[in-house]
């Protein structure tokens, strides 16, 4: 795959490695760093001192398993214990205890966390790196104005400006600016020190008048001047300690803390040698920045490209978790300080355990995972989705951009993205370009930068050495592009290669090349790398394909693709969908839910995932691949997961497709399919829905789960057991009771029905005072009950003691309205399901499975689907599978076409079917109309592409309403499927009906069917007795609402009723 002459062997890194490395960095370094920052806490009399001993902290292994945490809605976390000491200064006694600080959510083998039973993942964020950046803008006179922006670690910004007279100003707010001399003086320098530390002292002296000298005469004067401009305070403020503290808090802490990365960037940009541990902005930094700004004014130095990746940093999982840990420790410090003071006040003897409570840390992390924009619910539609979600990069989030304000330049592809951020895989819509995906080989470096690997080409060494370079480093090298991998050094013409140098693309001699790419997939994300023949597709269609593969539903019988790229096995392995042997041994027992592996003198039980629900309601299930008694090795696959076959990703099916218009049924991307796909369960998928109900303890008593529900029909309760919960294996329909529940309530004597009062008076029967609050199966939920769980929360309050969950499995065949897609952005909706005898058929009598519109190919420019289609046909006839790396034209011109035609020709010879490859129209064939038996006029492309069924299914979207709830104010039906809402007849619909003159239908839609309260009540009665519907005389509710709104604007509006007989006008009050 990497060529013959100059290849090196490299393995693709684990796709979850980014998440693992981030979490390990947090556990190893982040925890310790934040714990060391925890201060020593003293009481008000300074007699007692509390401190933490960081060296002895420990994390305890969780007591519960991951699967139990999901089912019981718990957090899979580890308890953090730290040694703490309480020192009495008078007696010099110390009490030391190991204290429990709180729970830290752990990361599992998929790179995700389980919080309150939900899989959550933390997204990496791209931020502007702290440091100084220079740019130039034109003012209103067309003159270039140079500015230097200092960005702190907190995201705060300060600007240095240089005006026409070469005076330098520091902008402290949008409107206020002060002289650089005042700022330097306020930071502690006098005039002599300032002039000694700058390269252009004469420029600084040129704008030093008497007024300026007075301002910087002393540090106090400078601070007062600075405070006056920064806080916009009028009058004459007085210098004080509190004024300095306020300035320190509001300005210097937020805008002058550079951090570790900012200090490194500042030193490199301004040629400084300030130690790395000095993370605050110093006067020396300000003066060096001013010198650089003066140099730019006179044509020395270069401006910065703010969108270059060398000026960005990645805020990884480690940084986000460390920030939250620091926040939790600040809250813990406040709690300890308050507890010490309270204990002294009440003359109690405190101990370290009594002073520290766990809620600050636990609640901080729970709120972070639940509310932070970068913590998202893991998308688990299929195995590919899980991996891709963890490799996302977002410009959005706290301290970042927003979809409304981000410019086109930020969203656009930048040359520095090469090999680091995928140029194809991004969101569609308002977030396009703001949410990207990591390239396959990219990694996050020590300084928060994205690094990409290259092979070093050296004449001195014959071996191949791999380098990881940060975004700024590779600009100094000549980097050969991917098509140099198969370079033949013996041919003189091929010694000129395309290369990249300083963001430009050149053609240079091979001897001048310093580095070369290591892999054809190096530039792309996982989703884009799974598209065969991607080089023949338009990038917009490749983007749609990489997004739609994540929406593919796992099918009941998966099938691996005939034409792939070779990355399917790695994607399946890293997804966690497969069961893999952790050690070698022999299989001694197999079952649907577990495998027993014997080895090293003991037996290991490996549990399998059986009918597990994902958060997109798809079915996660593992199927055995190894027989009983077989000896296996470590790392061998024991069971396939959902959407995997033989350890490879299998998201769809290879089906026989013809590209031909058919009676308009495939107009505008509609798709025609055969009934074989339904009857043989080709595109059948299982979906699992979860329904839950809680039992509370009310003021009238506890709610009761029972099967004795009064006033309900018996057939609705037929599936309940003695406890009142639906039985496993039951088939349930819409409206059936899943859990019977009664809620006690106080009922007044007057509210009893007459028959209830009669029973109480004559027979003395006590009528039930409970209200029925059962869990009923909503519309569209019919299916088979596969699991029931009655969960009591550990340590839960009596307010919400129990939860009952019912899991129902649905079998969904493909039907009209479902969405299908290929791997090249070719998507469509099923428009009709034809009998197989009516479908077009091939010369060997086989009917095609799908009919696509050929007009969807040329305008979309996704020709890769044609290559895949024809090669898939050859592969199915020859019983071969192809794994083709992209950009195979690097070997020779028209390599893809030659491969496809040669395989079709071989298939034609081996199967003795000349129609497979006809030289007059290669790749096409004469096919016949199934209805008439006549051949179509033109030869047609037929083949076997890989087609996916997507999560956008008609069962989840189609909706109808006969009756339902109404809005309180307008009395119109609610909106939306979830609320059993109705359709709105808007302006354009009214115009359409007016155009056809259907006055009575229009009146019905605007009155009876909408918001006329009295009229819609009369409709029910007249429908039952078979009478005629009366004409409504008064106004509908929305008209009455409009009248009242106009009255609030002092406008009176009335309507009148004109009699048909005598034309009398009767005024009606709205």
UniProtKB/Swiss-Prot annotation:
GO MF term list: DNA binding; DNA-directed RNA polymerase activity; ribonucleoside binding
Listed GO CC annotations: chloroplast; DNA-directed RNA polymerase complex; mitochondrion
Catalytic activity: RNA(n) + a ribonucleoside 5'-triphosphate = RNA(n+1) + diphosphate
Cellular compartment(s): Plastid, Chloroplast
Keyword tRNA-binding: no
Subunit description: In plastids the minimal PEP RNA polymerase catalytic core is composed of four subunits: alpha, beta, beta', and beta''. When a (nuclear-encoded) sigma factor is associated with the core the holoenzyme is formed, which can initiate transcription.
Entry keyword set: Chloroplast, DNA-directed RNA polymerase, Nucleotidyltransferase, Plastid, Transcription, Transferase
Phylogenetic lineage: Eukaryota, Viridiplantae, Streptophyta, Embryophyta, Tracheophyta
Disulfide bonds: none
Keyword Nucleotidyltransferase on entry: yes
The protein's name: DNA-directed RNA polymerase subunit beta
Listed EC numbers: 2.7.7.6
Species: Solanum tuberosum
GO BP annotations listed: DNA-templated transcription
Biological role stated in the UniProt entry: DNA-dependent RNA polymerase catalyzes the transcription of DNA into RNA using the four ribonucleoside triphosphates as substrates.
Gene: rpoB
CDD domains, alphabetized: RNA_pol_B_RPB2 (cd00653)
UniProt family annotation: Belongs to the RNA polymerase beta chain family.
First-listed, main subcellular location of the protein, grouped into a coarse class: plastid
A Pfam family recorded for this sequence: RNA_pol_Rpb2_2
HAMAP family with a match to the protein in the record: RNApol_bact_RpoB
